[in-house]
């Protein structure tokens, strides 16, 4: 038993400190693997936090507990023990660093599962694209940068449409218990109701749980009844029906990414190839090579103004020359 020191003004301590010292988790996960997934050669992916670098082979190595594990490096960036109201908004440079940190850490141990969002996170385009720059072009850029990373790309419902965070007008429109708790924490810390709601709106997982935007009809075509969460007001502009036959839509771009990954001509490079970061010090730019039997260069410019970078040429994909 441990009696942990309080880490907040309410006299309580985050459970994460206890989790970091938990023992015997590997024994349980190994038994679960052997008695369930392994017997059927089933694919499994774990939500893993606080793992040590030397433990990664245990989780996703040749005989790992799971087939893969999600990359949460960018989702926990800027977190604060004080609460959401004190969390930092991630920048393009920080996002780039998080992605490359994971890529270097995992290496060829196994395949990490790359995400922009999921059911427990806000919408990725609202989180990782700078405020005021969220548009179809930037949504495609973010999707491409994430999808082309080494690993297994996961697409959460609505991500392929570029669905965005909802604008909550009142805390009464929020359902998630953690969001309601964080609203109280912000108020107790001295935030105004408006400031507390803004913090909750930015990070609430209810953003990813609003009704799927199928059409521009009633309740976004999700239901003829009353949905339990507010429908995002932008459903008339962002919905599946309007993007189905639009070759320039966000959805069409994701289809192209999927087709590229499945293309036998590029599979060896896109799926199994190495990842080599490039121009890491260039502000508002994320770029990397994928190297296999071919060499592909993936570049995303976060700013409206063009940038100039020195391009490498190489007679061999694995031996770049200036």
What do the predicted segments below correspond to?
Residues 320-322:
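N-terminal low-complexity segments that are often proline-rich with Ser/Thr-Pro
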Residues 1-310, 314, 318:
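Active-site and adjacent substrate-binding regions of carbohydrate-active enzymes
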């Amino acid at each position: 038993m441990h009696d942990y020191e309080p880490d907040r003004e309410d006299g309580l301590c985050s459970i994460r400190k206890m989790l970091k010292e938990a023992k015997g988790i590997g024994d349980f996960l190994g038994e679960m693997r052997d008695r369930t997934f392994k017997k059927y050669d089933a694919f499994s992916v774990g939500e893993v936090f606080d793992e040590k670098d030397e433990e990664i082979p245990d989780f996703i190595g040749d005989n790992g507990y799971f087939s893969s594990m999600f990359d949460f490096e960018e989702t926990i960036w800027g977190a604060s023990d004080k609460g959401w109201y004190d969390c930092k908004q991630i920048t393009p440079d920080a996002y780039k660093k998080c992605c490359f940190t994971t890529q270097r850490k995992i290496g060829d141990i196994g395949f990490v599962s790359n995400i922009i969002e999921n059911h427990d996170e806000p919408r990725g385009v609202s989180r990782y694209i700078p405020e005021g720059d969220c548009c179809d072009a930037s949504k495609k850029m973010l999707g491409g940068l994430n999808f082309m990373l080494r690993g297994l790309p996961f697409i959460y419902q609505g991500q392929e449409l570029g669905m965005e965070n909802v604008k909550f007008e009142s805390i009464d429109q929020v359902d998630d218990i953690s969001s309601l708790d964080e609203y109280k924490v912000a108020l107790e810390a001295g935030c105004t109701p408006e400031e507390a709601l803004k913090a909750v709106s930015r990070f609430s997982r209810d953003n990813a749980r609003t009704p799927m935007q199928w059409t521009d009809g009633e309740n976004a075509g999700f239901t003829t009844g009353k949905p339990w969460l507010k429908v995002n007001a932008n459903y008339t502009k962002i919905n599946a029906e309007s993007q189905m036959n639009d070759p320039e839509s966000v959805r069409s771009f994701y289809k192209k990414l999927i087709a590229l990954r499945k293309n036998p001509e590029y599979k060896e490079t896109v799926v199994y190839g190495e990842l080599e970061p490039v121009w890491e010090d260039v502000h508002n730019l994320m770029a990397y090579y994928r190297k296999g039997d071919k060499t592909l260069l993936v570049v995303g410019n976060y700013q409206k103004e063009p940038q100039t970078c020195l391009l490498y040429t190489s007679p061999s994909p694995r031996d770049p020359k200036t």
